[in-house]
């Protein structure tokens, strides 16, 4: 089962894809979106679904540290509903607490990306990788 992992933000969507066996996640791209103009990146996502023959989506669910729903949960849920309607594929959710923080740390400490502008271009993709990889790991444990 091949899945697309999405880190849905207010201006961009970070995208990752699993390998065909559902073991590892790799970054793919960052899709610009414009909520005010109702541009949710569906055209780009459609191409990716076809290209990777995706069977579903994993979206990050931005919870607060105490486990309650964060402000952006509604954004992720709305995107999940759009994806289900558009593609007819299942949408799964994974707790994304601290994925952006972890992504920033990885990019600075392990990849040596100290330039904030440079990191900004890939941090959403890295967060999508972490969301998807966490989901894949949990599925293998079950």
From Swiss-Prot:
The superkingdom listed in its UniProt entry is: Bacteria
Alphabetical UniProt keywords:
Cytoplasm, Hydrolase, Nuclease, Ribosome biogenesis
Molecular function via GO: nuclease activity
Q: Name one GO cellular component term.
A: cytosol
Task: Enumerate the SMART domains for this protein.
Answer: YqgFc
Enzyme Commission number(s): 3.1.-.-
Name of the protein = Putative pre-16S rRNA nuclease
In which organism is this protein found?
Lactobacillus delbrueckii subsp. bulgaricus (strain ATCC 11842 / DSM 20081 / BCRC 10696 / JCM 1002 / NBRC 13953 / NCIMB 11778 / NCTC 12712 / WDCM 00102 / Lb 14)
